[in-house]
Amino acid sequence: MKFLPTTKEEMKNLGWDSIDVLLISGDTYLDTSYNGSVLVGKWLVEHGFKVGIIAQPEVDVPDDITRLGEPNLFFAVSGGCVDSMVANYTATKKRRQQDDFTPGGVNNKRPDRAVLVYSNMIRRFFKGTTKKIVISGIESSLRRITHYDYWTNKLRKPILFDAKADILSYGMGEMSMLQLANALKNGEDWKNIKGLCYLSKEMKQDYLSLPSHSECLADKDNFIEAFHTFYLNCDPITAKGLCQKCDDRYLIQNPPSESYSEEIMDKIYSMEFARDVHPYYKKMGAVRALDTIKYSVTTHRGCYGECNFCAIAIHQGRTIMSRSQSSIVEEVKNIAGTPKFHGNISDVGGPTANMYGLECKKKLKLGACPDRRCLYPKKCLHLQVNHNNQVELLKKLKKIPNIKKIFIASGIRYDMILDDNKCGQMYLKEIIKDHISGQMKIAPEHTEDKILGLMGKDGKSCLNEFKNQFYKINNELGKKQFLTYYLIAAHPGCKDKDMMDLKRYASQELRVNPEQVQIFTPTPSTYSTLMYYTEKDPFTNQKLFVEKDNGKKQKQKDIVTEKRKNRK
């Protein structure tokens, strides 16, 4: 199936008089494997279910959201690939004018708190519906327990309490949504399906109890305790179920879905995707996001970097789920054979490109360690890093007919390259020689060790060593390529002096004037956001300076980008 239906006429052409599942998304309908709603929808179709999709429905009117009719089984609501509040506002709470996932690029289609809006629209325009409303995607996933909301500067209830929904599917949703669809179809109990949350009047036996919502409101230390327990119970092997009381009911979080095998990953990414905007939405204008992802290929999911400001470990998991080389090669061959393909693959990667195929054997058997991280403060000895598999893959991809260039645009952990004594240099040389164009983007995020420690990242000595190796190999290859650096201003603990020191180090040691500086955004369910709200280091309980004035946050950024050079 090239496209999921979004009109009655398309349903008729498929011979359907109704659908089983109605997907509703805050993004326009891009039919690619980078669209979570589409992945889930096509996975359900692969298993015999009829699925339709409504993208960016008009709010306050029934015409859009009801045009495919009521589904037989459930509604599946997502705010989109990006949290709707992050999509709509900058780190200093200014309204964004552009949206790369909206036709025409104007940010006028995605409502604030899209999951809540769409769920309420279903209750309003499908009056008396008995079909389940399931919320999913990153916006729901990261708000599944009591969470800090930056945009209102307060703790909010688990999103199920506000959304008027029945079920929350968290993390990677293909398997849990398929199991739910089968259970509802067969009239079976769904409340033990992994990867789901729901509300109950009673606690669930043998599940861990988090501090209640009211206890979190009363004492920030309770909120820290709740988050620690929540974070430690995200591993598919070791996690226990969780309960959290809110008012007179409980949020029940079942343990996470199992990590996907290579076979399942291959099946998911072997499904047919149009790699285009659905014609119904295409006529509304160009979609900028397509330029980046149309010819990009996912190699794996998950990340064990566990940077404190990042939610990938909570959403995709700390265990790497990789596709086989043959599956990736086959996808690139298919792309290379399409009529309008220009010869360049925009990206081959995942959350962290060079974690493909690299996982700790102990973790795969026993689950993630509860008392240490894989890469911080130093790489664990149990994690054997060898980039040979990735070099082999890249060489295979380069040989495919009609391929001019395979780019790696996903992030790369340069500390892992340095830790790989066997193939790290070979991998870096391969990247520099054939897989970047003019510059390589890396994300040290800061240069001051105190701030890097709060971020959960390596010290700057690692950055310096990598920089030297990068330019050494460039010189050997006769290339004039550069490193560019992603940096963060106003992270909890960071003061003006830290940004001045960063600026000095960047100028004197890195020999750059940084431009890629973003202000820290406290998104739900990260340790850095926990620091921002509590003004404490949650690992030491020590008090932290946290810059909360938006003007002063901007000043921290400007110190590095020199926009206030002539100001007092």
From Swiss-Prot:
GO-annotated molecular function: 4 iron, 4 sulfur cluster binding; catalytic activity; iron ion binding
Residues annotated as binding [4Fe-4S] cluster: 303, 307, 310
This protein's UniProt keywords: 4Fe-4S, Iron, Iron-sulfur, Metal-binding, S-adenosyl-L-methionine
Entry keyword Transferase: no
Keyword rRNA-binding: no
Region (Disordered): 546-568
Domain spans labelled Radical SAM core: 289-562
Cofactor needs: [4Fe-4S] cluster
The organism's place on the tree of life at top rank: Bacteria
PROSITE patterns per record: RADICAL_SAM
Pfam family, one: Radical_SAM_N
Cofactor note: Binds 1 [4Fe-4S] cluster. The cluster is coordinated with 3 cysteines and an exchangeable S-adenosyl-L-methionine.
NCBIfam families the record matches: SAM_YgiQ
UniProt record similarity statement: Belongs to the UPF0313 family.
HAMAP family the record matches: UPF0313
PANTHER family: UPF0313 PROTEIN YGIQ
Stated name of the protein: UPF0313 protein FN0734
